[in-house]
Every structure is written in structure tokens, then in C-alpha cells.
Amino acid sequence: MTGADNAISVRGLTKKYGDHVVLNGVDLDVARGSVFALLGSNGAGKTTLVKILATVLSADAGTATVNGHDLGQQARSVRQAISLTGQFAAVDEILTGRENLVLIARLRHQADPGEVADRLLAQFGLTDAGARRVGTYSGGMRRRLDIAMSLIGDPPIVFLDEPTTGLDPQARIDVWNAVRGLADSGTTVLLTTQYLDEAEHLADRIAILHEGRIIVDGTLADLKRLLPPVEVEYIEKQPTLEDVFLAVVSDDDLGRSA
């Protein structure tokens, strides 16, 4: 894959806080129009990496390009090409869902804020709830509205940092459907998660970040090939992503302690 095929390319990215190394030479490539899942435990450095790529934080070393723009030299162009949503929906609970969208569309100087709002409400299955105050929405509805708001202005790249944290199973599925819809429309999605099933359901490619380093990176099939199938009562059982995650993290820890 050439650099032109990548929406995001990262080489040797490093971040420290005092003596604590959060990111230790991260390399990764995210293909355009794909869903890339960055999988890791709490404290692995996932959110720090996303904040650096979104220009919220600066790296101590390394290089990155986002939508063809150099992160260090063209931060403004990077910001114009991305949208970032965090673990908690940044919506105004007093306003209706439609009013939230119209407000952001006006702030982003859209020609027809009302049309933008109605289109996004339909895209995320919120048309019937558009006239209701967001304070009455379920967690999944708020998160979908938050993602919809992040798409105003049609950014080609969306960062979703732990988008289903704290949601019930049905709400998580609703958000998953919204994320797949983004990729189907050509948007590049970089998703951070600690939920293995989320990465398994959504991602075209998965990287495992452990103690500040990418220790494996590939498709789900690639990762499963890292472990051999086992026989359970004469039935061959393929490894799950959970099996792979636990094995590679354990191997990495053993290698570092040896």
C-alpha cells in the first residue's frame, strides 16, 4: 500500500510525561475509507495517540501525516480534515436533537443548516426523535447524535475514542451500525476501544497497543493466524480475538522481562 492510499501514516511517534513513556515509537497506517481499531487496555496510550493525531497534544518525537498533511507543519489543515468524538457525548441536553445539529451547522458556516440537520437525523435513525430535547434521549441516541454532529462539514477522517463506553448492549449495536455506515460512505474511521467484540465486529484492520507500542497489526484473520486452532472434544476451535489479545500481550510482557 502506498502513502497515497493511507488516510493516516504514523512513524516512530513518542510521548512522555516526565519519566513515564506513554507512547514508545508507534508505527501504523490507516487505509482510506476503512475502519481501523486501536485495541488496548486502560493506560495503553490509545487516547494519547488519538489526541496527538487530532492536534490536541504534541508528540515528543516521530512523524505523522493525516489526510496527506504533515502533523507538525500543517496542523490547521489536519484539523480541517478530521473530527474527534470522545467517550462522553458532547451534546446540549436542553436543546432538541435537531437544534443541536443546526447550531453546529451554523457554527461551521453550512449553507443550509436545516437541511444538514434533517439529513443527519435520517442517516442516524433519529428523525422521529429530532424534535425532542436531548435530555430525554437514551445513551445510545446521544452517542449517535454526537457522531452525527461530528460529521457536519463532511470531514474525511473521524476519530472515535471509546465510543461505546458505558452503553447497554442494544445502544452499542446502534453505535456499531452508525460506524459501519460511516465506512460504507467512504469516511475513514480510527476507533479506540478496549472491547474485543467491538473491534471484531467493526474493524477492517486491528492494532493492539500495549505499554505504548504496537505489538501486532493486521486483519482479524491475520491476528487469528498467530494462534493455532485447538481441538475441543474432537471439534477444531478457531482462536478468538480475545485469545489472540491475551496471548500476544502475555508474550510481550514475558519478552520484556526476560
What positions do the PLM features span?
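Conserved ABC transporter NBD signature motif
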Residues: 62-73, 77-78
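Conserved ABC ATPase "signature" region
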Residues: 83, 102, 106-129
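Catalytic Walker B motif of ABC-type/P-loop ATPase nucleotide-binding domains
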Residues: 158-162
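ABC ATPase "signature
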Residues: 217-218
